Amino acid sequence: HDPVHAGERYTEDRFSFSEPALGSGSLHTIGTAGMRFSEFRIHTPNPVMLLDTEPAETAESAFILEGDVESAFNNMKGTVRFGNQRHNFHYNTDFSGRHTLLSGRFHACTLTYNPSFLDELMAAGDSGSLTAFRRHLDKKRPFLGIPEPVQWHYEMHGIIAAIRQCRFEGLTRYLFIESKMMELF
């Protein structure tokens, strides 16, 4: 574990792991007061199942850069499958479940929203696409942006690259990253 920054408003951490013959990977997280950007990489010779056992209310955008994953959540029927260069948005009152990484190489970024922060964002604006989501959020019902993950919008590539490759330092770095995270909403 490498704590890069731990401030009052911003945090940044890096983790890496390696087990001979089983696989290796890394996790890079950047947290703000209301959002967390995570970049996850794993390399394994075989498919791997990850369990998320903590039932937490969460909203998350997932961006798959490489590989395939199939997810099943404890309070939803069926599975959701994400592939290379796909994206989706998901809100759930119980984010616990299992995620099966189907390929030996997996690279993804997620943007996780704090529920109270998300509620404030939703109150600030109202558009047709957000209205359906707002109803689910108000009633605490799971919401999947669309039944199937979609191809990334061209602009998303640039925004995610700007976050991942940000060369600013100190407070400027975190203000820049936070503004880019807001662009992804």
Language model segments and positions:
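N-terminal functional module of multi-domain proteins
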Residues: D2-H107
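Alpha-helical bundle regulatory/interaction domains
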Residues: A72-F185
